[in-house]
UniProtKB/Swiss-Prot annotation:
Region annotation Disordered: where it falls in the sequence: 76-97, 201-222, 256-285
Keywords: Endosome, Golgi apparatus, Membrane, Repeat, Signal transduction inhibitor, Transmembrane, Transmembrane helix
Keyword Repeat belongs to the record: yes
Taxonomic lineage of the native organism: Eukaryota, Metazoa, Chordata, Craniata, Vertebrata
Gene Ontology biological process terms from the UniProt entry: negative regulation of SMAD protein signal transduction; negative regulation of transforming growth factor beta receptor signaling pathway
Record protein name field: Protein TMEPAI
Organism of this sequence: Xenopus laevis (African clawed frog)
GO cellular component: a single term: early endosome membrane
Signal peptide: none
């Protein structure tokens, strides 16, 4: 029994030793894995921090350089303005009187830095040129909205960037037709006008040269200025003088009746004047 008990005890001790060694190995592997993971995490964190530091330093350097350049330009502009103002104040005093009574002439010689420097107003214009002007200025001064119209080289029904439609297309075409007319191809002789005013009613236009048809309306009134004496006499043949001399009594009554008509007042006055002159010239014959 004791032997058996001893064997059992030895076997148990062996099993316990084996289990201990296995547990120890497992714990070592786990600790090694954990330590490796932690090391990798630490390395990643350090790299990220270094990258962030580099980015921040680059940004700070960039803004520092831009701020320095801006301050330097501003200081240079102030110095130039001060130099120009001081030179402008000293400019009128070109000659000064010394203590000995000798007049000393001061000649202005520009410095090389002044020759190479750009005036301050040009710098201001250059900086203001790049400032945003639209739409702030337009809102401040309350300008109306811009309307893009044609440049006039397109046909009357404007097509393209034109956004303003003043009239209907048909109305615009009708206006274009009415505004552009062909010259008249028919003329009215002065004798036809006189006959129409005396006997009433318009006569058909003749082919002879005379007053244009556009200057003669439907009611027989001359719209333009009255014809001159030479024009009226030039159109009459010689036989018309004798024809006008014979009815000496009938023509005044006809002329007086025509004078009463308000529509033919302008034409009748010219007719009477021309006939009176014809009578005066026709009496010796």
């Amino acid at each position: 029994m004791h032997n058996l008990m001893g064997l059992n005890s030895t076997s148990e001790s062996i099993h316990s030793n084996v289990s201990c060694t296995c547990n120890c190995k497992r714990s070592l592997f786990q600790t090694m894995e954990i330590s490796e993971l932690e090391f990798v995490q630490i390395i990643i964190i350090v790299v990220v921090m270094m990258v962030m530091v580099v980015v921040i330093t680059c940004l700070l350097n960039h803004y520092k350089l831009s701020a320095r350049s801006f301050i330097h330009r501003h200081s240079q502009g102030r110095r130039r303005e001060e130099n120009l103002s001081s030179e402008g104040n000293l400019w009128p005093s070109e000659s000064t009187v010394s203590g000995n009574g000798i007049i000393e002439q001061h000649i202005y010689t520009p410095r090389p830095s002044d020759r190479l420097s750009v005036p301050s107003f040009l710098q201001r214009d250059r900086f203001n040129r790049f400032q945003p002007t639209y739409p702030y200025i337009q809102n401040e001064i309350d300008l109306p909205p811009t309307i893009s119209l044609s440049d006039g080289e397109e046909p009357p029904p404007y097509q393209g960037p034109c956004t303003l439609q003043l009239r209907d297309p048909e109305q615009q075409m009708e206006l274009n037709r009415e505004s552009v007319r062909a010259p008249p191809n028919r003329t009215i002789f002065d004798s036809d006008l006189i006959d129409s005013s005396v006997y009433g009613g318009p006569c058909p236009p003749s082919s002879n040269s005379g007053v244009s048809a556009t200057s003669y309306s439907s009611n027989g009134r001359m719209e333009g200025p009255p014809p001159t004496y030479n024009e009226v006499i030039g159109h009459y043949p010689r036989s018309s003088f004798y024809h006008c001399q014979q009815p000496n009594l009938a023509t005044p009554s006809i002329l007086e009746s025509n004078r009463l008509q308000p529509g033919n007042h302008g034409l009748d006055s010219t007719i009477t004047r021309s006939k009176d002159k014809d009578k005066q010239k026709g009496q010796p014959f």
